Design a protein with these regions (language model features):
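Cysteine-centric segments in proteins
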Residues: 17-146
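C-terminal motif of bacterial Sec signal peptides marking the signal peptidase cleavage site
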Residues: 12-13
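Sec-dependent signal peptide recognition
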Residues: 1-7
Length: 146
């Protein structure tokens, strides 16, 4: 009985939380505050079928204080880091009620799949396309806790 209780306590202590808040200056590599989500991502094959899931980190990078919203430093971003060290940054848009969402239209497409996953179709400045899915919940979390 004591062993199983100890094992359960140790497992609970080692379980990683989905969201981590980091205040400004709390890390060596990022000066502003940010929110990190431990999520799953999977690449999508040319036939539209997803590959195996792999861990990924999703960051919400808020605007820097006193930065103009017309500049990159004055906007909200989501940065997705894949397990192979690739990363993408996606600017977010805010509506009149200050609810954040992914942009739609243009060369990029971001669509909820209705099964807890979101499909991202992105193109970088060079025209290289990237298609992947993620089970990120960061926008729901941010909009619920604003």
């Amino acid at each position: 009985m004591k062993r199983s209780l100890l094992a359960a306590v140790l497992l609970a202590a080692c379980t990683q939380t989905r969201f981590e808040h980091h205040p400004s200056g709390s890390t060596d590599w990022m000066t502003g505050s940010f929110l990190r989500e431990h999520a799953q991502c999977r690449t999508v094959r040319p036939d539209g079928q997803p590959d195996a899931e792999a861990p990924c980190l999703i960051y919400h990078l808020p605007p820097m204080p006193d930065a103009s919203p017309k500049t990159a430093l004055g906007r909200h971003f989501v940065q997705i880091e894949f397990s192979d060290r690739r990363r993408v940054q996606i600017p977010l848009i805010a509506d009149r009620r200050h609810q954040l969402s992914f942009p739609t239209g243009g060369d990029s497409g971001i669509q909820p799949q209705g099964n807890g996953w979101t499909r991202f179709r992105l193109a970088d400045e060079g025209g290289t396309r990237s298609v992947f899915d993620s089970d990120t919940q960061i926008l729901d979390y941010l909009n619920r806790n604003r």
